[in-house]
UniProtKB/Swiss-Prot annotation:
Belongs to the AdoMet synthase family. It comes from Shewanella frigidimarina (strain NCIMB 400). The keyword Chaperone does not apply. Gene3D superfamilies: 3.30.300.10. This is S-adenosylmethionine synthase. Homotetramer; dimer of dimers. Mg(2+) binds at residue 17. It is found in: Cytoplasm. GO terms for cellular component: cytoplasm. The gene is metK. K(+) binds at residue 43. Its main location: cytoplasm. It catalyses: L-methionine + ATP + H2O = S-adenosyl-L-methionine + phosphate + diphosphate.
Length: 383
């Protein structure tokens, strides 16, 4: 492979689409805390002065949708009407109904192990050894930049920052190996009284330099900090937000394929979410075991059917064993039926709100990031 560039982007927790994702997952967590067997599909729409929460839920739990919504918005940092969006004054509309009984009869089984998939679909999981968290570097560092923006905003280091922000990082590769960072874009909402010069200096010294490894930066690296020159109007005032619109930010930054299904607001019976987590778990363990430098796994399902309709693996020429052997090892060591993968990763619990900003993958706080199968995989592969 010749020299090439690859770019990924991320957005902060205050981005309108991420506000929506976090509200949807906060509602999901509140329900799962009371009823781990609940069926939840929660969608959120945010715009100036209002939040609409809708979807389908089947549960014995009762949760206060309005209070959950306000608390989530408050924690993100929209606490002042000057921003055009305020946790205490925004309208909260609740349009949640019940899940279709036609879906229930396809999913629920007398034997839990035979629980059918909640929908048809295809999901991908990916891992690469180019970072210590076995994730692609572009998305990893794009997340780190907006996470740092949030930290210095909240701890008072840069009190004039506002919650909405976006990052983009372009890495240069030679023969598949990182040789540097070609370009960095960071746009952050700010208070009106901050000059462009002060903002550029503060972002460079307080956000970019502490996050990006110095050995990847050079005299040719290009920096674009608030390139429009002004970012005062942001959040839901600037753009409406909707659950599930940042699926590439949520996963691998475009480095791997995506089946199209969003994650936030969905309980683990929805394989869009749970099987994508399981696929990441499988791919990460294959790479951690040294069976490949890069691994992408696809799994697919039919609604109401427990067994996956297909499993396939791509190692991009980096595999130490054949892909047929890898698939056999996957079937031997991992449970990919909906009930089994939920149990394998302990997914029927309130862990989802923290996934809804800064990436679902590459953070060791989540069970699908464990590499506890790597040793057994390596042994059974004969390496």
């Amino acid at each position: 492979m010749a020299k090439h560039l690859f770019t990924s982007e991320s957005v902060s927790e205050g981005h309108p689409d991420k506000i929506a994702d976090q509200i949807s997952d906060a509602v999901l967590d509140a329900i799962l805390e009371q009823d781990p067997k609940a069926r939840v599909a929660c969608e959120t729409y945010v715009k100036t002065g209002m939040v609409l929460v809708g979807g389908e839920v089947t549960t014995s739990a009762w949760v206060d949708i309005e209070e959950i919504t306000r608390k989530t918005v408050r924690e993100i940092g929209y606490t002042n009407s000057d921003m055009g969006f305020d946790a205490d004054s925004c309208a909260v509309l609740n349009a949640i109904g019940k899940q279709s009984p036609d879906i229930n009869q396809g999913v629920d089984r007398s034997d839990p192990a035979e629980q059918g998939a909640g929908d048809q679909g295809l999901m991908f999981g990916y891992a690469s050894n180019e970072t210590d968290v076995l994730m692609p570097a572009p998305i990893t560092y794009a997340h780190k930049l907006v996470k740092r923006q949030s930290e210095v905003r909240k701890d008072g280091t840069l009190p004039w920052l506002r919650p909405d922000a976006k990052s983009q990082v372009t890495f240069a590769y030679d023969d598949g190996k990182i040789i540097g960072i070609d370009a960095i874009v960071l746009s952050t909402q700010h208070r009106e009284d901050v000059t462009q010069a002060d903002l550029i200096e503060a972002v460079m010294e307080t956000i970019i330099k502490p996050v990006l490894p110095a050995q990847w930066l050079n005299k040719d690296t290009k920096y674009f900090i608030n390139p429009t020159g002004r970012f005062v109007i942001g959040g839901p005032v600037g753009d409406c937000g909707l659950t599930g619109r940042k699926i590439i930010v949520d996963t691998y930054g475009g480095m791997a394929r995506h089946g199209g299904g969003a994650f936030s607001g969905k309980d683990p019976s929805k394989v869009d979410r749970s099987a994508a987590y399981a696929a990441r778990y499988v791919a990460k363990n294959i790479v951690a075991a040294g069976l490949a430098d890069r691994c992408e796994l696809q799994v697919s399902y039919a609604i109401g059917v427990a067994e996956p309709t297909s499993i396939s693996i791509e190692t991009f020429g980096t595999g130490k064993v054949s892909e047929e052997v890898l698939i056999k090892l996957v079937r031997q060591h991992f449970e990919l039926r909906p009930y089994g993968l939920t149990a394998m990763l302990d997914l029927a619990r309130p862990i989802y709100q923290q996934t809804a900003a800064y990436g679902h993958f590459g953070r060791d706080i989540f069970p699908w990031e464990a590499t506890d199968k790597a040793e057994a995989l390596r042994a059974d592969a004969g390496l």
